[in-house]
């Protein structure tokens, strides 16, 4: 068990941890699939998304996230033999701000903001994150996006930028608790940099790694929800 009292800031991954991006993606695409490929399992679609998105983020690290999504959708169409549809690509690229928070997100953030500064480290652009912040309903001390860092997680550069900015606020690396759903994007790079990490295993009751690449990494703490993390914190501080 980690000692919660030693931290001053909680840094969160956003999409997959705070925001249910898999639901946002599948809800948008399901009406299209009804015509294109009604028997395609959502698990296969999400794993294809993970692979193709990662390719563009690695090859074109300065590409803004809507453009990553637009190109990812084009590759998905090609992979499954669907006819190219620019309208679908544009809708997919512009959908980020409508992806919903998990049911426990807002209440958990409201609880944690009473105890810590909050920050977001996210693989999106600033405009998309700005829309999402309205759904989260709490203030964040710091947000660092792929657009800010000109690279995508799991690149250490995005983490290093956030760490440097927090150090300028008087917060040391040892006082940062990083929380994320993706071992690939968050837990593995966080551990490499010496951060204390919490893995929110949102997919604990599902097969596969969903919309992220599978990676082996050992977090300091594993929970299945933010609500569980809140409960652990309450038990330790009261």
Region spans (language model):
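Asp-based, Mg2+/Mn2+-dependent phosphohydrolase catalytic module
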Residues: 1-10, 43, 106, 110, ...
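N-terminal helical cap/lid subdomain that shapes the substrate entry/recognition surface
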Residues: 2-103, 110, 114, 127
């Amino acid at each position: 068990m980690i000692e919660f009292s030693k931290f001053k800031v909680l840094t969160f991954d956003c999409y997959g941890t705070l925001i249910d991006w898999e639901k946002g993606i599948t809800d948008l695409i399901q009406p299209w699939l009804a015509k294109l490929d009604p028997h395609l399992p959502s698990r296969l679609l999400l794993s294809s998304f993970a692979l193709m998105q990662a390719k563009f983020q690695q090859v074109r690290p300065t590409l803004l996230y809507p453009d990553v999504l637009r190109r990812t959708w084009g590759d998905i169409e090609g992979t499954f033999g669907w006819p190219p549809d620019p309208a679908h690509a544009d809708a997919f690229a512009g959908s980020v701000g409508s992806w919903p928070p998990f049911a426990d997100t807002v209440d958990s953030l409201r609880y944690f903001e009473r105890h810590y500064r909050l920050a977001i480290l996210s693989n999106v652009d600033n405009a998309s994150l700005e829309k999402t912040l309205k759904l989260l309903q709490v203030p964040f001390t710091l947000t660092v996006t792929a657009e800010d860092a000109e690279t995508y997680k799991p690149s250490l550069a995005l983490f290093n930028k956030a760490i440097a900015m927090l150090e300028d606020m008087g917060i040391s690396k040892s006082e940062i608790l990083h929380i994320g759903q993706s071992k690939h994007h968050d837990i593995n790079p966080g551990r490499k940099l010496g951060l204390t990490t919490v893995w929110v295993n949102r997919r604990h009751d599902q097969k596969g790694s969903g919309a992220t690449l599978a990676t082996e990494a050992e977090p300091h703490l594993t929970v299945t929800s933010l609500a569980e993390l809140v409960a652990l914190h309450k038990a330790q501080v009261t």
